[in-house]
């Protein structure tokens, strides 16, 4: 089984990082570095079903079906991820903890199986690393002290 695990430290409070990764208006700004999908129907509440909706590409319909499985604000978000009809159901986990005056963010995406899962994990791993090293820091830098976007 293949998996993605990425750890980043950000110089912002866990509440600020939590807001950036759970506010439906902010999510498309950092996922896939601004070209990511909007999180239709997302709520940080266990049982909430939502979809990441992006521009379709050859071989992909542009929709990921998800369900929030566990929430412990502001330290844990866990949700299922199904990228294709009939495809494997994988799991995404965000863990946030105070660290060195900021936040340590751990991203995990697990449950990829077979050779197709191996290649999907490699592809998504590359995209996620860019999102968390470029996209999310840019959004965090644009938030004011109250968590709103600076205009």
How should each PLM-predicted stretch be described?
Residues 5-6, 15, 23, 40, ...:
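Hydrophobic/basic alpha-helical segments enriched in Actinobacteria
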Residues 1-3, 108-115:
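A short small-residue
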